[in-house]
């Protein structure tokens, strides 16, 4: 379903966020964090 796809993408982005923060790549981390917020909002509206 669409929700499963979005949840999979959310998990992928959260993994990327953790990696970027660990590597102290904060610009990319901020971009990914914004995508996560957008995706969480979209999932909550399903």
Q: Over which residues does each language-model region extend?
A:
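Flexible coil/linker segments and helix-coil junctions enriched in charged and small residues
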Residues: 13, 24-25
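Amphipathic alpha-helical coiled-coil segments
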Residues: 38-46
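Short, charged, amphipathic alpha-helical segments
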Residues: 26-37
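Short amphipathic alpha-helical heptad-repeat segments
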Residues: 2-16
């Amino acid at each position: 379903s669409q929700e499963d796809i979005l949840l999979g993408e959310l998990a992928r982005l959260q993994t990327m966020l953790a990696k970027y923060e660990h590597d102290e790549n904060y610009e990319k981390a901020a971009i990914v964090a914004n995508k996560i917020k957008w995706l969480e909002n979209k999932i909550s509206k399903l």
